[in-house]
């Protein structure tokens, strides 16, 4: 019986793992779609989903807790002004993990991690330029 299951080790030291998940969280909040390996994606979900739940209630204490995890003022602002209100009615499940084949060099399983209900980007300007 393993009490209090933690995060996977991912063959990294604890400081490297913390920094990697912090950088991946910031990238996901910035771009709302990232490509990574499947085990990293599953661990990233455990970090990102509680942060979005925290952002639903905009208080100084919650902003400080989010800043302690992200260490990026711009991402904390985006989290509380855009993402928190966007997912206010959703009770969880803010991320989607899609399997994306295997990496060329080492055959590692890859995945796309995206935030659900993200705005779709239209390619209309490219069509006008082609004409």
From Swiss-Prot:
Keyword line: Ribonucleoprotein, Ribosomal protein
The organism's place on the tree of life at top rank: Bacteria
Biological processes per GO annotation: translation
Molecular-function GO term, any one: structural constituent of ribosome
Keyword Amino-acid biosynthesis belongs to the record: no
The keyword Ribonucleoprotein is assigned to this record: yes
A Pfam family this chain is assigned to: Ribosomal_L17
GO cellular component terms listed in the entry, alphabetical order: cytosolic large ribosomal subunit
InterPro entries: Ribosomal_bL17, Ribosomal_bL17_CS, Ribosomal_bL17_sf
Subunit structure: Part of the 50S ribosomal subunit. Contacts protein L32.
Family: Belongs to the bacterial ribosomal protein bL17 family.
Protein name: Large ribosomal subunit protein bL17
């Amino acid at each position: 019986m393993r009490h209090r299951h933690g995060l996977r080790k991912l063959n990294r030291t604890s400081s490297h793992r913390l920094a990697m998940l912090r950088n991946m969280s910031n990238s996901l909040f910035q771009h709302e779609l990232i490509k990574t390996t499947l085990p990293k994606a599953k661990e990233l979900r455990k970090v990102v989903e509680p942060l979005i739940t925290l952002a639903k209630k905009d208080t100084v204490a919650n902003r400080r807790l989010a800043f302690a995890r992200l260490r990026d003022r711009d991402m904390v602002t985006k989290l509380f002004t855009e993402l928190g209100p966007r997912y206010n009615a959703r009770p969880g499940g803010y991320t989607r993990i899609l399997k994306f084949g295997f990496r060329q060099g080492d055959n590692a399983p890859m995945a796309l991690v995206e935030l659900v209900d993200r705005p779709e980007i239209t390619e209309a300007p490219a069509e006008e330029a082609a004409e």
